[in-house]
Amino acid sequence: MLISMDPLETPHSCIELTKALGEKGVINFSQVEHIIMKYNRSVKEVFQLFDLIRILTTDHAILTRITREVIEDFASENVVYLELRTTPKRNDAIGMTKGSYFEAVLEGLRSVTSVDVNFIPHDKEDSRTLFSPNNGSSRKRIYVRLLLSIDRRETTEAAMETVKLALEMKQFGVVGIDLSGNPLVGDWNTYLPALKFARNQGLYVSLHCGEIPNPKEIHQMLDFKPERIGHAICFEKEHWEILKSSKIPVEICLTSNIRTLTVRSIQVHHFVGLYKTKHPVVLCTDDSGVFSTCLSKEYKIAADAFVFTGLGKRESFELSRNAVELIFAERQVKEDLTKYFDSVAKTMGVYKNKIHSYEL
């Protein structure tokens, strides 16, 4: 479930943070302002923006703020389960290690006050679940779980360091490993040892797959059989056959794919073919700030564009409910969410609650 944590809830919030670093001499603001404000960006421009985000998120205080704001934003639109993807980074100039980076994320989780957040695995808490009748809270509630991302620019050793950090932090809601970053760089065999180790140690694995034409790597990724893949755009016939036979769930990011021009138009998006054949899919935002979207908007885009597939209110609700089986959280969370969705289905004429995944 592609949700990336980034400082771009709006272009203005990114400009605010960038200006602050510009005043400190860390960034030349005039060189990046136009990239922030641009609406449609090419793949190359998107990764230029990600380079800026990388700088912004190598600051503990900013990272804590972003984490808090991302959770509050998704909770405000009735998201009840959120997987946050975040790439642990180093910044020797300020003493940031991958470990201290993660601690800043944790501080952001703990600092949320507007909503009840559950990020500790269920077996570490009492028997009450977040949506159980005896919970005793009338406030908005949200489950949050974390995926630590391996950046494609990293070495095998750096990738392994991220996996080991994920294992150390499982008690704080880390459920898996993600492979992401600029698809134009790196080689699959660089990350494979770390990904195999992660799987052998019980972590789930999600891969950004097929963002650009790379038939060999796509085949290698599908052969690895990750628990989920994101995008699946530049697939050839052979890749589609492998994907559909393996039933690997796909994270669909409509706005992201259109604005990076990797899909020609919404009408020809591969979501239709996957949905009609009942392949496991889930709608996601990718980087919601980068692409100026939110989960509600992604569902509306799908409903408006694919009405001919019969994707009405009930089907959209079922699409979100079915995503419960695709999340990386523990069994008790899945059971709690399923009961909650069933309760909503019985009591509300309009279905309002969603499942989602995001990145920092």
Predicted features by range, described:
Residues 1-203, 211-217, 221-228, 233-360:
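Metal-cofactor-binding active-site regions of metalloenzymes
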